[in-house]
Amino acid sequence: MYRIYTRTGDNGTTALFGGSRIDKDDIRVEAYGTVDELISQLGVCYASTRQAELRQELHAMQKMLFVLGAELASDQKGLTRLKQRIGEEDIQALEQLIDRNMAQSGPLKEFVIPGKNLASAQLHVARTLTRRLERILIAMGRTLTLRDEARRYINRLSDALFSMARIEETTPDVCA
């Protein structure tokens, strides 16, 4: 039988990828825990939209967040074993998505109040979770090394989610 519990965290510590242990209230755990929360919220967004292109983008974002989560959950030894990290090309892909979506949805004429439909509201929840993650990463970067690409990706991700919510709000007959 495969068990998902190890009992090693019962004392309030957790293992990083690489083997070292840290307290469960360490800012790194807060960061990768928020990444996990965001991945789950993007799954809710995926289930809420009927637009195939948005689903494809959301799934790609989830995969990149797993990459980020692995980096945040790694110690120095673990970092050397990672096969992938967020790079400049990932940031550029988000910028292209934002530009396409904003061109399609048109200029903003007023502040956006979330809730026009379920899918857009869920995307706005994901956007605010992303902003929280960004604040955590900024705080984390004050005491620990954090690659600039990771922080920049999260900054763009919140804008990408906003642009996707705008698509949901401005596309007729897509209310989920």
From Swiss-Prot:
InterPro entries (alphabetical): CblAdoTrfase-like, CblAdoTrfase-like_sf, PduO-typ
Principal localisation: cytoplasm
Organism encoding this protein: Citrobacter freundii
Key word Membrane present: no
Alphabetically ordered keywords of this record: ATP-binding, Cobalamin biosynthesis, Cytoplasm, Nucleotide-binding, Porphyrin biosynthesis, Transferase
Domain of life: Bacteria
UniProt family annotation: Belongs to the Cob(I)alamin adenosyltransferase family.
Record Gene3D superfamilies: Cobalamin adenosyltransferase-like
Pathway listed: Cofactor biosynthesis; adenosylcobalamin biosynthesis; adenosylcobalamin from cob(II)yrinate a,c-diamide: step 2/7
Annotated catalysed reactions: 2 cob(II)yrinate a,c diamide + reduced [electron-transfer flavoprotein] + 2 ATP = 2 adenosylcob(III)yrinate a,c-diamide + 2 triphosphate + oxidized [electron-transfer flavoprotein] + 3 H(+); 2 cob(II)alamin + reduced [electron-transfer flavoprotein] + 2 ATP = 2 adenosylcob(III)alamin + 2 triphosphate + oxidized [electron-transfer flavoprotein] + 3 H(+)
Source species taxonomy: Bacteria, Pseudomonadati, Pseudomonadota, Gammaproteobacteria, Enterobacterales
Documented EC number(s): 2.5.1.17
Protein name per UniProt: Corrinoid adenosyltransferase
Presence of the UniProt keyword Cytoplasm in the record: yes
One cellular component (GO) term of this entry: cytoplasm
Binding site for ATP: 6-14, 24, 131-136, 155
Compartments where found: Cytoplasm
MF annotations from Gene Ontology: ATP binding; corrinoid adenosyltransferase activity
Entry's Gene Ontology BP terms: cobalamin biosynthetic process; porphyrin-containing compound biosynthetic process
UniProt xrefs under Pfam families: Cob_adeno_trans (PF01923)
EC primary class: transferase
